[in-house]
């Protein structure tokens, strides 16, 4: 039995959508993108959605269109995918690294609070692995310091924080549609916002700074999504709640059948909906095997695993700084391990994975 750590799920609907676009002759950005944006904004309970060609572009566009630039600081969690920080550097600003909560792995409000300076212009909170960060205290800090809040929702399509979908809780929400995500467009991303003027700036930024054809009123990039990607996205969006329901089913199964092991299972924040982009456990020093030994044993049995993430961002060579301390992020990076939780994992495979984990330990 071979069980991959991630596997995109696409069917006849996606194939038909791509075929429809190919037959239309509109292969770049056109009506499919506009339709997908409208549907995604409605799904996220946001007023505007702007489609882009990847999640990093979404973050870059959100920051740059908010005026973030040279001399500014943006607080980001160190335990995340590196794009959470590089989007800041792409604007000429400086990422400042906050530590994370040891239970939920998301940005620690107390750590973030200590990092605010006169140069702080934004905070990027990451809804990591499908779990919302604690938005209220971070949003309050931003209001107190006249900073904006950006949601990195690349892994959290459909997550809910205190009754509200993520993506509409700050200045902007930034999503990724990479093939391993909860829904995909192949490659792609989206920015959601409730600010019409800001949305217009983002639209110019992702289209060479054009306010109308061949009239360039600001600097910008080509971050446009194609109609092919958007057509796939519309088909996937119809299935997203079903995908997330299956992910939750799989996570619940793990919770029930691995609770007697000494592996630390993922905690779930109250009043929130976790959509389990990843099911991330901790293999601590108290465990009988090292994380690497456990991963090798599972690999030998055909079970895919992964480490998200082995090096915290503040320890990456491009950002390594002696004056940055994020001890929780550093500890997590040495302990975390992801198990397959995607919608194509069957009950039979779940049983096999749990039986194997219990056997090897």
Describe each region flagged by the PLM.
Residues 168-204, 210, 227-230:
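Active-site PLP attachment segment
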Residues 26-73, 87-91, 97-99, 164:
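Phosphate-binding glycine-rich loop
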Residues 1-26, 31, 340:
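N-terminal "arm"/small-domain region of PLP-dependent enzymes with the aminotransferase-like
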Residues 64-153, 160:
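PLP-dependent aminotransferase-like
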């Amino acid at each position: 039995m071979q069980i991959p750590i991630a596997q995109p799920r696409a069917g006849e609907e996606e194939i038909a959508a791509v075929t429809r676009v190919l037959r239309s002759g509109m292969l770049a950005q056109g009506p499919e993108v506009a339709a997908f944006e409208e549907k995604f904004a409605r799904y996220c309970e946001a007023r505007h959605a702007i489609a882009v060609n990847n999640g990093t572009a979404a973050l870059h566009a959100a920051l740059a269109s908010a005026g973030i630039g040279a001399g500014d600081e943006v607080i980001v969690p160190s335990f995340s995918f590196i794009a959470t920080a590089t989007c800041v550097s792409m604007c000429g600003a400086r990422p400042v690294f906050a530590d994370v909560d040891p239970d939920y792995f998301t940005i620690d409000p107390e750590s973030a609070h200590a990092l605010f300076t006169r140069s702080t212009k934004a905070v990027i909170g990451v809804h990591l692995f499908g779990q919302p960060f604690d938005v209220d205290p971070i949003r309050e800090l931003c209001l107190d310091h006249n900073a904006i809040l950006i949601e990195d929702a690349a892994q959290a399509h459909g997550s809910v924080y205190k009754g509200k979908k993520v993506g509409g809780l700050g200045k902007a929400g930034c999503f990724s549609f990479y093939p391993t995500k909860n829904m995909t467009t192949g490659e792609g991303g989206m920015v959601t916002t409730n600010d019409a003027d800001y949305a217009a700036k983002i639209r110019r930024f992702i289209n060479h700074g054009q306010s109308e054809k061949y009239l360039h009123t600001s600097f910008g990039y080509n971050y446009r999504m194609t109609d092919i990607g958007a057509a796939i996205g519309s088909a996937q969006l119809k299935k997203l709640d079903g995908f997330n329901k299956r992910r939750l089913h799989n996570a619940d199964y793990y919770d029930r059948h691995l609770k007697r092991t000494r592996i630390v299972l993922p905690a779930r924040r109250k009043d929130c909906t976790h959509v389990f982009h990843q099911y991330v456990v901790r293999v601590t020093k108290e465990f009988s095997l090292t994380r690497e030994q456990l991963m090798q044993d599972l690999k030998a049995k055909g079970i895919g695993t992964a480490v998200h993430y082995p090096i915290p961002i503040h320890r990456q060579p491009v950002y390594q700084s002696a004056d940055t301390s994020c001890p929780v992020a550093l500890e997590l990076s040495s302990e975390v391990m992801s198990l397959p939780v995607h919608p194509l994992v069957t009950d039979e495979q779940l049983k096999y994975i749990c039986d194997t984990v219990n056997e090897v330990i």
